Structure formats: structure tokens, C-alpha cells
């Protein structure tokens, strides 16, 4: 017992006196792990973000290989690297074996799968929930992955900290390729193992206490970051639930003649669907739909949940390919889509709107100059420098509408745009929809929107399409839909018995 107490006392003295030998080992450990973590994070964050959005034939096999690599024992990794770096190995000419570089390589190889897998999961979760918004703006996969990774930068920071903790706690690989040479390649974990086996408990205990302190500090930082994020998200959620202030309902504002130098006369076919079918596995979401949508129409898609409204909008926006049939679009058609839950990046409103314009083909300077006017149209000009995630739900929807409107589209697709809004915010968005659809400069503007609100459909639509089980059961002018005879299923829906 006295021996243990003496060892602990000596270990504490080594730490408090900043023993040179102890300090050298600690600093070398931090340098190796920090360098390895930096290399692994540069590669892993990029690879993981790309894997989160990319779709290719062998993706499943790649993910299986990635997940398998997470469970590789560190000594096996060290053995493989030893064989590669040995004099007779293919990388022996580098002369890295039993060096600082070999240990950095070993830890980087161990940490890389962790960073890649965690980053992929974080980005893929956001892509699955909100990726359609960026796709509708025209963001290609690589840019989408970078935008989503940047938007999840808090999660990425926690991944980096986790990776460093994994690296500095590793022992097997660095011992095999580093050799644990005193004064050259000895790090905390290997020194603890060696000094314990030699019976030098004070130094082993001192290094163990320092290592535990480093790991504890990393976990404290992670805990504080999580608590801060929970509080921040709760505050933003509370803000989002606050009803919008009673800002004036915007009047229809004249919009400049199309920036792309042409007009679409009323009646011009924009979309032509021929026997279009969409399947999600065994489920038929759209079943042989044939219809045409022309310029100047205000088309409402109605039907019960799961009837195919959102899928039809995604098909029109080219976010979904038909399994059978065809979808033809007018040449050069400019379109934009608004979702029930818009996705705005954790950046200013102005940045979000400018991003939409930039993706539409404007230079960043042009997009930046155009955003104040776009935000003013939706009565958000005074909030242009606010973080988009700090706004209320209604303000976020109006911001997304500004992002779509600024692109000067010929047709605006909206997926239940007012479903989650308070009454005043609903009226504001409806007024903006009417402003968009108002004819101007001989140019017919087109709306296609889905809604469960039949009062809204009466106010806004010139044509109503009723869907059930992926089929069009009624396609009529709005007056005839609400006042004329209907198929029994549509009649029950209008009466409120098939919601």
C-alpha cells in the first residue's frame, strides 16, 4: 500500500514540477495526434460529406467497407503499416518506419474511418430531410455536400474533437510502427505500457493522469457544446413558434420583364405528362398520370394524405424520375419550388437568397445586389442580416419564397406552403402567391400548389386536380370542381369525409 501511495505522490510531483521527460512525451503525443487528426479530418470530412449525398452503383459496398474499417483492431492496422513501411515493403523507400511520420500515418489511418462515417451520417440525415430544397435550387451533389457540411459545422466540430480523443488514446498501431523509442517515438500510451511493464509506476501513473485529464477535457468541451446547442435550438424553436407580427399584407408588385429575354404567352404548354408512373419500392405513388399544365394557370393539387400530390410536384420539378411514361417540359423553362418546411442555411437571409440566385446562373456580385429587393418584396428587408434559422416559421417561409421568386421563374411549384403557418402568416403567403401569379408585361405566370385547405384553393386556383392513390380522378376548372358534379371520391373529399 505504501508503495502505491509513494508512486502516486511521486507521479503528482512529476506533473506539478513539469518533469522534462514527462513534458517531452506529452508534447510529442499531442503533436502526433493533432497532426494525424488534421490529416484525417481534411480527408474524412470531404469524403464523408460527399458520401452523404452521392448515389452510385457500388455505394452500398463502399459503406459496408467503411463500417467494417471502424472495427479494425489498432494492432492489425499497425501490423499492415509495418509490412508496408518495412525495408522489404512497397513503401520501405520512404524510410518512415520507427519515426514520427509513421506514428502520424498510423493514427490518421485509424481516425479516418471514424471521421468519414460520422460526417456521412450527419450530412445524409440532413440531405434526407431537406436535400430536395437544394436540389430544386440546382445545387449539384458536390456543392450540396459542401453546403450541408458547412451547415452542420457544429456536428463536424464534435466529430473533430471525437477524432482527436480517439487518436490520442490509441496504443497498438503507434507502438508497432513507432517502436516506442525513448526520446524519439515514445508517446503517452506506449510509454504507459512500457513503464508499467518495467515497474516504473510513478512515470506510468503521471502519464496516465495527464492522458485522463486530456480525455476528460475533451469530453467536457463536447458536453458544453451540446448544452449550448440545445439551448440555442430551444430558443430558436420558441422564436419560430411566435406568431408573425402583423405586417401589412403585400400588394401585388410589378416584376420586371423576364430577365431571360422572352415571354410565355398564356396557354403555352409547360409540362406534358404521358402515363407517368412513380414507384417507391412496391408502393405505386403515381399511377399512369396523363395531363398538361399551361402558362398562366393556377393549378391546385388536392387529395388525402398519400394521394400523390407531393410526388407529382417532385416529378414536375425533376426531383423524381418516372419509372414509366414521360415528362416533357417547355424548352428553357425556368421553375422554382417551395416546400412545406423550407430549408435555409445557418446564415443570413441575404446569403440564402443570394445563394439561390447564384445557383440560377448569376454571378455572386449580381446575386448580392439583387437580394435586398427580393427580401423587400416579402416584407423582410429589415431582417436581411438576421440568421435565417432565428426567424419565425412564417418568416422562414416568406424568405424561401423570396429565394424562389428572385430567380424569376416562369412557374412556381409549392408543396403545402401554408400548412404550418398561423392565420396571419397564411394570408401573407397567399397574398405573395397572388402577387407572383399576377400577369405582367404580357407574361403569364404559373402556379402549381398542393393544399388541404379548400378555402385557399377556392381563393387561389383556376384549376383543381383531385388525386387518389396516385391517380387523377378529377381535373376541372375551379368553379366546376366546387359547384358541379364530381366523382364520388372527390365529392366525399370536398365534404370533408376523406381527409
Tell where the protein language model's regions lie, with residue ranges:
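Conserved ABC ATPase "signature" region
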Residues: 140, 365-383
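C-terminal transmembrane helix and the adjacent membrane-cytosol boundary/short C-terminal tail
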Residues: 114-130, 135, 147, 205-257
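Conserved ABC ATPase signature
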Residues: 387-391, 395
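Catalytic Walker B motif of ABC-type/P-loop ATPase nucleotide-binding domains
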Residues: 412-415
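Helix-to-loop junction immediately C-terminal to a conserved catalytic motif
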Residues: 317
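The feature captures the beta-strand-to-loop junction immediately N-terminal to the Walker
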Residues: 302-304
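A short, surface-exposed alpha-helical micro-motif characterized by mixed small hydrophobic
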Residues: 457-459
Amino acid at each position: 500500500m505504501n508503495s502505491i501511495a509513494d508512486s502516486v505522490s511521486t507521479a503528482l510531483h512529476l506533473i506539478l514540477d513539469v518533469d522534462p521527460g514527462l513534458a517531452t512525451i506529452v508534447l510529442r503525443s499531442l503533436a502526433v495526434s493533432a497532426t494525424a487528426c488534421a490529416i484525417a479530418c481534411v480527408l474524412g470530412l470531404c469524403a464523408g460529406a460527399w458520401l452523404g449525398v452521392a448515389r452510385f452503383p457500388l455505394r452500398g459496398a463502399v459503406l459496408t467497407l467503411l463500417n467494417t474499417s471502424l472495427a479494425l483492431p489498432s494492432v492489425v492496422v499497425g501490423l499492415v503499416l509495418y509490412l508496408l513501411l518495412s525495408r522489404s515493403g512497397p513503401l520501405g523507400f520512404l524510410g518512415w518506419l520507427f519515426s514520427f511520420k509513421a506514428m502520424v500515418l498510423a493514427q490518421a489511418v485509424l481516425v479516418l474511418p471514424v471521421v468519414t462515417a460520422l460526417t456521412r451520417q450527419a450530412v445524409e440525415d440532413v440531405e434526407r430531410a431537406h436535400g430536395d430544397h437544394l436540389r430544386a435550387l440546382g445545387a449539384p451533389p458536390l456543392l450540396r455536400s459542401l453546403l450541408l457540411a458547412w451547415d452542420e459545422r457544429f456536428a463536424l466540430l464534435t466529430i473533430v474533437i471525437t477524432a482527436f480523443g480517439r487518436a490520442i488514446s490509441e496504443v497498438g498501431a503507434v507502438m508497432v510502427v513507432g517502436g516506442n523509442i525513448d526520446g524519439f517515438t515514445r508517446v503517452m500510451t506506449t510509454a504507459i505500457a512500457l513503464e508499467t511493464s518495467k515497474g516504473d509506476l510513478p512515470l506510468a501513473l503521471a502519464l496516465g493522469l495527464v492522458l485522463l485529464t486530456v480525455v476528460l477535457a475533451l469530453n467536457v468541451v463536447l458536453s458544453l457544446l451540446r448544452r449550448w446547442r440545445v439551448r440555442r435550438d430551444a430558443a430558436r424553436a420558441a422564436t419560430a413558434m411566435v406568431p408573425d407580427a402583423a405586417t401589412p399584407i403585400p400588394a401585388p408588385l410589378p416584376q420586371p420583364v423576364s430577365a431571360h429575354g422572352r415571354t410565355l404567352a398564356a396557354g403555352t404548354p409547360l409540362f406534358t405528362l404521358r402515363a407517368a408512373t412513380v414507384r417507391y419500392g412496391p408502393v405505386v405513388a403515381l399511377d399512369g398520370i396523363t395531363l398538361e399544365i399551361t402558362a398562366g394557370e393556377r393549378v391546385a393539387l388536392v387529395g388525402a394524405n398519400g394521394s400523390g400530390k407531393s410526388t407529382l410536384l417532385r416529378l414536375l420539378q425533376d426531383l423524381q424520375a418516372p419509372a414509366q411514361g414521360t415528362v416533357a417540359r417547355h424548352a428553357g423553362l425556368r421553375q422554382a419550388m417551395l416546400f412545406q418546411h423550407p430549408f435555409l442555411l445557418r446564415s443570413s437571409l441575404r446569403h440564402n437568397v443570394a445563394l439561390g440566385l447564384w445557383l440560377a446562373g448569376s454571378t455572386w456580385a449580381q446575386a448580392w445586389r439583387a437580394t435586398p429587393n427580393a427580401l423587400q418584396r416579402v416584407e423582410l428587408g429589415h431582417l436581411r442580416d438576421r440568421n435565417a434559422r432565428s426567424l419565425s416559421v412564417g418568416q422562414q417561409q416568406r424568405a424561401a419564397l423570396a429565394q424562389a421568386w428572385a430567380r424569376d421563374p416562369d412557374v412556381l411549384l409549392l408543396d403545402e406552403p401554408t400548412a404550418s403557418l398561423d392565420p396571419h402568416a397564411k394570408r401573407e403567403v397567399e397574398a405573395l402567391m397572388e402577387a407572383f401569379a399576377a400577369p405582367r408585361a404580357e407574361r403569364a405566370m404559373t402556379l402549381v400548389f398542393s393544399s388541404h385547405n379548400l378555402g385557399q384553393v377556392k381563393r387561389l386556383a383556376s384549376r383543381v386536380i383531385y388525386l387518389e392513390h396516385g391517380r387523377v380522378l378529377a381535373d376541372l376548372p375551379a368553379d366546376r370542381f366546387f359547384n358541379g358534379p364530381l366523382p364520388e371520391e372527390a365529392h366525399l373529399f370536398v365534404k370533408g369525409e376523406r381527409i
